[in-house]
Amino acid sequence: MSCQAFSADSFTTLAGDSLPLLMHHASAADCLPSSASTHTHNMVSAVPSGLSLLQSSKRSHMHLSTSTLGNGPPGLHYPVTPCHYSNQQTTYGMMAAQEMLSASISQTRILQTCSVPHPNMVNGANTLQGSLAPCLYKFPEHGLGGGSCSLSHSFPPLPPAVLSEEPPLGGTKDLRLRSRPPDDPPDMDSPQIRELEKFANNFKLRRIKLGYTQTNVGEALAAVHGSEFSQTTICRFENLQLSFKNACTLKAILAKWLDEAEQAGALFNEKMGMNERKRKRRTTISLGAKEALERSFREKIKPSSQEIVRMAEGLHLEKEVVRVWFCNRRQREKRVKTSLHHSSYLTKDSPTYRYPYLSPNAIKP
């Protein structure tokens, strides 16, 4: 069956009793004209008579008045006389799959043709009164068409969760968890912050005491943990310019490095102490011993070794202390004499400044 678009020339005047032929069917086929409905009925009735009946007839009593049809669009008036529909019985049999598919395709094409009115129908509505009545009724959602006269059955309805803009109850909890901001750092007066500040200050003092710079620490950590550690990282940690999470992570690493550095420094100091010559403690000479040594120096500037031993025993001092004192005293005396000699030489050889003599004749009024 081929479907062609309706035109103004293809419509013929229908009788009043033939117009509502399929009004009792609650399906999309209710919009069809009498010729299309007759064709559809013939296709359904072509099923073999041996098949069992599945659906009983529907009885409906409808009363169509002229006032009801007057509520339609302006300009389309159909002179339909009030009528009372009698009981009609329609039998639907079991259709084969191929015949069911062909019937559905035919009905869909006819519905598409009926749903889109031709422009000539609107323009020539006055001349075609009574030829075709529009589908103005809302039928129950059951029957072959599965709905009203629209083409909504061609597209599956969207679920209400997609149409609604508000998220479902279960999704609201997930959205809150996803949009939850990260954990805020603790307050400035919290024990964690105070402990972190204390460790940063202690780390800086111990690092300086061990003789390491921030660059040394950064290079040592970068060799083990990667290139993300540098002098800038250590500086920001000591100045508490890192985030709380990063500072806590770096604190554990620096604490471990500091313990290892102190152990290595202790071993190094022990080795250096064994090889290094011990320096003697500075000796303090009392005032009475200094006066005795000064008297001995005035008597003899450079005493012999036996005299130094005798003076050391008398003053309860070591021999080396007395010997060093006489050496230092001679050097100081030499510096004093040199400075005095140089100052006297400058006073003798320095010329005196004399003012020039001016004669009275040289002065002009």
Curated annotation (Swiss-Prot):
It comes from the Eukaryota. The keyword Transcription regulation applies. Residues 278-337 bind DNA. One of its GO terms (biological process) is positive regulation of transcription by RNA polymerase II. A motif (9aaTAD) lies at residues 5-12. Disulfide bonds: none annotated. Keywords: Activator, DNA-binding, Homeobox, Nucleus, Transcription, Transcription regulation. GO terms for molecular function: DNA-binding transcription factor activity, RNA polymerase II-specific; RNA polymerase II cis-regulatory region sequence-specific DNA binding. One of its GO terms (cellular component) is nucleus. Its main location: nucleus. Residues 188-262 form the POU-specific domain. Residues 160-191 are annotated as: Disordered. It is found in: Nucleus. Residues 173-183 have a biased composition (Basic and acidic residues). The keyword DNA-binding applies. CDD domains: homeodomain. The 9aaTAD motif is a transactivation domain present in a large number of yeast and animal transcription factors. Transcription factor that activates growth hormone and prolactin genes. Specifically binds to the consensus sequence 5'-TAAAT-3'. Belongs to the POU transcription factor family. Class-1 subfamily. This is Pituitary-specific positive transcription factor 1. It comes from Oncorhynchus keta (Chum salmon). The gene is pou1f1.
